[in-house]
Curated annotation (Swiss-Prot):
Binding site for NAD(+): G12, A13, M14, G15, R16, M17, G102, T103, T104, A126, S127, N128, F129
Catalytic residues of the enzyme: H159, K163
Pathway named in the protein's UniProt entry: Amino-acid biosynthesis; L-lysine biosynthesis via DAP pathway; (S)-tetrahydrodipicolinate from L-aspartate: step 4/4
Record keyword Oxidoreductase present: yes
Protein name, entry field: 4-hydroxy-tetrahydrodipicolinate reductase
PANTHER family, per database record: 4-HYDROXY-TETRAHYDRODIPICOLINATE REDUCTASE 1, CHLOROPLASTIC-RELATED, DIHYDRODIPICOLINATE REDUCTASE
UniProt lineage: Bacteria, Pseudomonadati, Pseudomonadota, Gammaproteobacteria, Enterobacterales
EC assignment: 1.17.1.8
An annotated GO BP: lysine biosynthetic process via diaminopimelate
Catalytic activity: (S)-2,3,4,5-tetrahydrodipicolinate + NAD(+) + H2O = (2S,4S)-4-hydroxy-2,3,4,5-tetrahydrodipicolinate + NADH + H(+); (S)-2,3,4,5-tetrahydrodipicolinate + NADP(+) + H2O = (2S,4S)-4-hydroxy-2,3,4,5-tetrahydrodipicolinate + NADPH + H(+)
Length: 273
């Protein structure tokens, strides 16, 4: 049976991630771009999105009004900021449209709200949509089961100078994966390195977080398991944003006909592999 085409709306269409998503949608035989959304008063509203991002003329004009586009898409993909994400989430909730959330930096209260919206629409929320990082989560879980009680654990993350949340959402997801295996509450077992002089030796049963913001680093995450005898280092590096975009688009296709619920990339990997 022929697979149903997924019609996708992209928010932040003229941003770095938005442009990569649109280019990858054009390459995917199972998807079509039907809405390219930007903020109000954007100077390119009304112009052809394809021409503006260098892929040739498309059938989609840049818009700031999701109400105009609401009948033209099945799934919305959002990689913006929490405030923008919630605006679009409320619209998707009202229109009964499914949504992919790639934004990070939500508060606990905002996460609870997202969970409540998933009772009516289908959502996939992930801090990182690359297949590689989601495989890293699985490796981390297995390593933690064996070494978690005998090692100091550290997460070191590197991103571009414009990333505003510290630590990264992916680093926190790694920490949550470790905490789940160890039966810890992450916020009670986190150690954030700052300037100063340590007054005591490092506490046990803590996950150390270090963040670097520099240049145009797409994303790199290293997890260390260090004991007095040896060290295991597990690293994932993203060379470009295409890996995130491809994963998000696969997520959109997967969630297209789901009725409701909150899902993550692990749900998709279970189906695919």
């Amino acid at each position: 049976m022929k697979k149903k085409i997924t019609r996708i709306a992209i928010t932040g269409a003229m941003g770095r991630m938005g442009q990569v998503l649109i280019k990858e949608i054009q390459k995917n035989k199972n998807t079509v771009l039907t809405a390219a959304l930007v903020k109000n008063n954007h100077p390119l509203i009304g112009q052809n999105i394809g021409e503006k991002i260098g892929i040739g003329k498309t059938s989609v004009s840049i818009s700031s009004d999701i109400n105009i586009e609401k009948n033209d898409f099945d799934v919305l993909i959002d990689f913006t900021k929490p405030s923008g994400t919630f605006y679009f989430l409320e619209q998707c909730y009202e229109f009964k449209k499914n949504m992919i959330i790639g934004t990070t930096g939500f508060s606990e209260k905002e996460i609870k709200t997202i969970n409540s919206y998933a009772k009516k629409i289908a959502l996939i929320k992930a801090s990182n949509f690359s297949i590689g990082i989601n495989l890293l989560y699985q490796l981390i879980q297995k390593t933690t089961k064996i070494l978690g009680n005998t090692s100091d654990i550290d997460i070191i993350e590197y991103h571009h100078r414009n990333k505003i949340d510290i630590p990264s959402g992916t680093a926190l997801s790694i920490g949550e994966n470790i905490s789940k295996v160890m039966n810890w509450e992450l916020n009670k077992h986190s150690l954030y390195y700052t300037k100063g002089i340590t007054k005591k030796i490092r506490e046990t049963k803590k996950i150390g977080f270090s963040s670097i913001r520099s240049g145009n680093i797409i994303g790199k995450h290293t997890v260390l398991f260090s004991s007095s005898d040896e060290e295991i280092k597990i690293t994932h590096s993203a060379f470009n944003r295409e890996s995130f975009a491809k994963g998000a688009i696969e997520a959109a296709v997967w969630i297209h006909e789901k009725k409701h619920g909150l899902f993550n990339m692990n749900d998709i990997l279970k189906d695919k592999f």
